[in-house]
Curated annotation (Swiss-Prot):
GO molecular function: 5-dehydro-2-deoxyphosphogluconate aldolase activity; fructose-bisphosphate aldolase activity; zinc ion binding
Swiss-Prot/TrEMBL catalytic activity: 6-phospho-5-dehydro-2-deoxy-D-gluconate = 3-oxopropanoate + dihydroxyacetone phosphate
GO biological process, one term: glycolytic process
Name this polypeptide is given: 6-phospho-5-dehydro-2-deoxy-D-gluconate aldolase
Enzyme category, top tier: lyase
Residues annotated as catalytic: 85
Cofactors, names only: Zn(2+)
UniProt keyword terms in alphabetical order: Lyase, Metal-binding, Phosphoprotein, Zinc
EC number: 4.1.2.29
PANTHER family: D-TAGATOSE-1,6-BISPHOSPHATE ALDOLASE, D-TAGATOSE-1,6-BISPHOSPHATE ALDOLASE SUBUNIT GATY-RELATED
Length: 293
């Protein structure tokens, strides 16, 4: 079947005011749950592997081979984007492109804006030459991401405008108050800044750290141009809670397939719930003609 680039999917989502969910792969069974959830809802889906998890999953080529085989064996018909999340370097992004990923994120948000722009431009030039989409980041999303703690640094409107103009990225992750991991208290997104950035850049925005954000805020973010919403912690909590219950109720069981079954079912259920919440259900039909890698 092949993977589709992210850019045209996000353009459609932004135009029609819905968002496509990004769900992180944490192994083969998780990938099956994500794909099955998207297929059941007839929604495009972004299956992501964070750079710090690539080696755990077996490497770039292993991830591409696994996801390609699964989409074929499971008869997946909806558009699937295979995305590198939080690419750590230019070289790692290029490796993902060469391996067959259809989208990459270069995370240069920890660098000064000039360096972030220069490095992102190099990634964009290489990726676009291979029909691969690119997401960039300005500002810093707080919380824990793959073992690294980051403080929130709000994106600057003028820096975002300059970043998009000079790099030609397909999507922008602008840090606006969300955090990776669990929230302490109710999340408070910067909607005034969000509106200004959306108006000045005119590219699809990406909301990182969306697990746990109330629906009212998510819907407002979608209306203000967020066409991609990243969910990982919510799936992990659903999985771990279900697995803990299974282990407690079946103390003598030892077969992994049975012990993990309910947890994986909860991952799929969470994917389906978020797709509906984002308004992406039944949006796959208009994407059949997309060029695939």
């Amino acid at each position: 079947m092949g993977f589709v680039p992210m850019a045209p999917l996000l353009a459609d989502a932004k135009k029609d005011s819905y968002a496509i969910g990004q769900f992180n792969i944490n192994g083969l069974q998780w990938a099956k749950a994500i794909l099955a959830g998207a297929e059941s809802q007839q929604s495009p889906v972004i299956a992501a592997a964070s750079d710090r998890l690539i080696d755990y999953l077996g490497g770039f080529q292993t991830v591409v081979a696994m996801m390609g085989a699964l989409t074929d064996e499971l008869g997946i018909t909806v558009p699937v984007v295979l995305h590198l999340d939080h690419g750590l370097s230019i070289e790692r992004c290029k490796k993902a492109v060469d391996a067959g990923f259809s989208s990459v994120m270069f995370d240069g948000s920890h660098y000064p804006i000039n360096e972030n722009i220069d490095m992102t431009k190099e990634v964009v030039a290489y990726a676009h030459a291979h029909n691969v989409s690119v997401e960039g980041e300005v500002g810093t999303v707080g919380g824990m991401e793959d073992g690294l703690m980051a403080e929130i640094k709000y994106a600057d409107v003028e820096e975002c405008q300059r970043f998009v103009c000079e790099t030609n990225v397909d999507a922008l992750a602008a840090a606006l108050g969300s955090v990776h991991g669990k929230y302490k208290g109710e999340p408070k997104l910067g909607f005034n800044e969000m509106a200004a950035i959306s108006a000045s850049t005119n590219v699809p925005l990406v909301l990182h750290g969306a697990s746990g954000i109330p629906d009212e805020q998510l819907q407002r973010a979608i209306k203000l141009g967020h066409a991609k919403i990243n969910i990982n912690t919510e799936c992990m909590i659903a999985w771990s809670d279900a697995c803990r219950t299974t282990f407690a109720e079946q103390e003598t069981a030892f077969e992994p397939r049975l012990l993990l079954q309910e947890g994986l079912a909860m991952v799929q259920a969470t994917v389906e719930k978020k797709i509906k919440q984002f308004g992406a259900a039944n949006k796959a039909a208009g994407s059949a003609s997309l060029q695939r890698r």
